[in-house]
């Protein structure tokens, strides 16, 4: 192994030298005290987890999980292809189809798998299909399109004019699919969904939208931005996750019967892997049902988002301004971003993980703040004042949001 260890060590050392080495903190979350967690025998406040609404600890969701555990046991017993469908996963798929006003749905073990295996399989099902993908699409989308080996075009981030030019360059009779996200996880910007839908109609293309960061949070029932804009019925495939706003785990797609059935019969990421256990699918179903009728969590969430953004404006903290709940604080240097994260945790009891290249472009290294309904005014003030002190200590300049947005967009274009 010595020869191979040398290769591994060289790879690790290179990442360390670039300030990109990732250390995973050992945390103990507290279901009865969200958003607190225990770290090295100290209580800390978490500001970076994707349990957006705290549904992982909601009493209805936890009780549903307990009941399913006692009724069905821990595991699912295998693949659906061999072991069949547990009734709980069929109920979940019915809820998801209704959530997005689609005929049916298909559940996967994660959002990554849902994107990866669905997109790769579409290329097997539809001969000569051409992919059109936003340049900042998630790694799971990139993986699926890449493994499909199909013809692909990458359009500039959120640039519908560039997208149209690329569409114009392809034979109108060739099958096409436009793949994009409703909200981009690292900058929080929304896609121009209606413009993309119009282009898809004009150039005879399918549409595939990733709503993982918006389901549960936007729309009357929590159906995401497509529901908020009342255009779910104009999008061919809506993909989402159960692991963020719904507080469990898993991913899914929703569409018409024929498309879903074709994916079910083709996608290796569905066929050859153990299905979600009933303890998870049942909990997810109850989480979705609750958020379909309750706006309390969404309203409180938006209130906290607004308060935090106002606080950052007041202290001139350089966050990337957007219309979503995702609040990136741009540091612009990998070493300093890591230091800010470590100082917040060790000196102030605040946990915010830094985000460095390759997750974001070089020069736009950042902290990504994720507010929840459980974050208090005191927590907001503590975070803001801690950042001001740390920025001063590390000689990081405070800058206006307007100047920052221009600077970051130039990085993205470059």
From Swiss-Prot:
Q: Which residues carry this modification: N6-(pyridoxal phosphate)lysine?
A: 244
Q: What is its EC number?
A: 2.3.1.37
Q: Which GO terms describe its biological process?
A: protoporphyrinogen IX biosynthetic process
Is-annotated flag, keyword Hydrolase?
no
| Keywords from the named record | Acyltransferase, Heme biosynthesis, Pyridoxal phosphate, Transferase
Residue ranges annotated as transmembrane are: none
Cofactor dependence is on: pyridoxal 5'-phosphate
* UniProt xrefs under SUPFAM superfamilies: PLP-dependent transferases
Superkingdom per UniProt: Bacteria
What GO molecular functions are on record for this protein? 5-aminolevulinate synthase activity; pyridoxal phosphate binding
Q: What is this protein's record name? A: 5-aminolevulinate synthase
- Coding gene? hemA
């Amino acid at each position: 192994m010595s020869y191979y260890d040398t290769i591994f060590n060289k790879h690790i050392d290179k990442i360390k030298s670039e300030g990109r080495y990732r250390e995973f903190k050992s945390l103990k979350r507290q279901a009865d005290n969200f958003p607190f967690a225990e770290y090295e025998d100290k209580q800390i406040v978490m500001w970076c987890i994707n349990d957006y609404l705290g549904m992982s600890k909601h009493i209805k969701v936890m009780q549903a999980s307990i009941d399913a555990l006692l009724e069905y046991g821990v595991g699912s017993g295998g693949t659906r292809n061999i072991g069949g469908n547990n009734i709980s996963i069929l109920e979940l798929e019915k809820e998801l189809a209704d959530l997005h006003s689609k005929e049916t749905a298909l559940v996967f073990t994660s959002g990554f798998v849902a994107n990866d295996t669905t997109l790769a399989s579409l290329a097997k099902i539809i001969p000569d299909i051409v992919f059109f993908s936003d340049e900042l699409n998630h790694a799971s989308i990139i993986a699926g399109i890449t493994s499909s080996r199909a013809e692909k075009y990458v359009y500039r981030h959120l640039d519908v004019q560039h997208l149209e030019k690329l569409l114009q360059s392809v034979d109108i009779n060739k099958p096409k699919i436009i793949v994009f996200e409703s909200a981009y996880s690292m900058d929080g910007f929304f896609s121009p969904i209606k413009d993309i839908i119009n282009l898809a109609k004009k150039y005879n293309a399918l549409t595939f939208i990733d709503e993982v960061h918006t389901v549960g949070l936007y729309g009357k029932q929590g159906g995401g931005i497509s529901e908020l804009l009342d255009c779910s019925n104009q999008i061919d495939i809506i993909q989402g996750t159960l692991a963020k706003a719904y507080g469990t785990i898993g991913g899914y797609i929703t569409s018409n019967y024929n498309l879903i059935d074709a994916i079910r019969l083709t996608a290796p990421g569905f066929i050859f892997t153990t299905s979600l256990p009933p303890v998870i699918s049942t909990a997810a179903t109850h989480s979705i049902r609750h958020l379909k009728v309750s706006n309390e969590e969404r309203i409180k969430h938006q209130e906290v988002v607004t308060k935090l953004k106002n606080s950052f404006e007041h202290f001139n903290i350089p966050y990337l301004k957007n219309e979503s709940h995702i609040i990136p604080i741009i540091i612009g240097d990998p070493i300093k971003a890591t230091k800010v994260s470590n100082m917040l945790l060790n000196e102030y009891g605040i946990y915010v993980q830094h985000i460095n290249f390759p997750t974001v472009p070089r020069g736009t290294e950042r902290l990504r703040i994720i507010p929840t309904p459980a974050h208090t005014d005191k927590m907001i003030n503590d975070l803001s004042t801690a950042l001001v002190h740390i920025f001063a200590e590390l000689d990081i300049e405070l800058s206006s949001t307007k100047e920052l947005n221009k600077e970051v967009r130039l990085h993205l274009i470059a």
